[in-house]
Amino acid sequence: MACIDLNADLGEGFGVWRLGDDEAMLRIVTSANVACGFHAGDPAGLLRVCRLAAERGVRIGAQVSYRDLVGFGRRFIDVTADDLLADVVYQIGALQAIAQTAGSAVSYVKPHGALYNTIVTNREQGAAVAAAIQLVDSTLPVLGLAGSTFFDEAARIGLRTVAEAFADRTYRPDGQLISRREPGAVLHDPAVIAQRVVTMVTTGKATAVDGTQLAVTVESICLHGDSPNAIQMATAVRDQLNAAGIDIRAFC
C-alpha cells in the first residue's frame, strides 16, 4: 500500500495575533513544521502548539528561517554562512527545549519561506543550513525539495533527506515553485488540489504551469495552513487520499 506524510506550517501567530487554525490542522496532519521565533511564533504560542501536537501524536519539526519577523521570512537576506549557521542552531535548540517541555521532541528540520527557496540553488547558504543541523543532531532528517543544492549538501554530510511536494503551489517547468508574487502561484479549489495530490502520490508526476509533466519524488505533502480555506483544503486532501487507499502516516 502506498503511504504519504502530511505536513503543515504551524505556530506562526504572535502574541494575540493568530494565523490559521493550528488546532484543527493538527487533527489532519501527521507532521507539524513549528515556527522557531525568527519569522513568526512567540514562546507561549509555540509551547501551546507543541503540547497539542504531543497530545495528538503529531510529529514536531523545526521550521527554521531567516531572521525576518516583519517580512514573515519571505524576503531573501544576504546573510553570511557563519551567521546563518548560528541562527539555525539557535532556532533548533529553542524548539527542542519547548518540544521537550511539551512531552515531545524535534524529529526533523524544514527551512521556511525565502530560505527554503534560496537554498534550492544557493549552495553556500544550503551548506550552512545543513552544517547547522548536523552540529545539533546528525540524526535529524531534513524536509525539502528534491534536486535542490540543499539536499545535495545535506546528503554529502550524511543527513537523511525527505522530499516533499506542495498541495496548493504551482511548479515551473524546471520543477521549482512559482513565486508567490506571480499570478497563479497558489491554487485554491479544494477538489482540484486533492486530486492533484492523489496523482502526485500514485504516479510520481505533477503538471507544470505550461503543461509539462514533471517527475516528482514525494514522501510528504505540504498543506499550507495560512490560506483562507486551509482546513477545507486539508480535509479534502486527506479524504481523497483515504478514498484512494493511501496510508497516511509520518515518514519513517
UniProtKB/Swiss-Prot annotation:
Listed EC numbers: 3.5.2.9
The keyword Hydrolase is annotated on this UniProt entry: yes
Gene Ontology BP terms: carbohydrate metabolic process
Function in brief: Catalyzes the cleavage of 5-oxoproline to form L-glutamate coupled to the hydrolysis of ATP to ADP and inorganic phosphate.
NCBIfam families, per the entry: PRK05406.1-3, PRK05406.1-5
Subunit structure: Forms a complex composed of PxpA, PxpB and PxpC.
Protein name, UniProt field: 5-oxoprolinase subunit A
Species this protein is from: Mycobacterium leprae (strain TN)
Lineage: Bacteria, Bacillati, Actinomycetota, Actinomycetes, Mycobacteriales
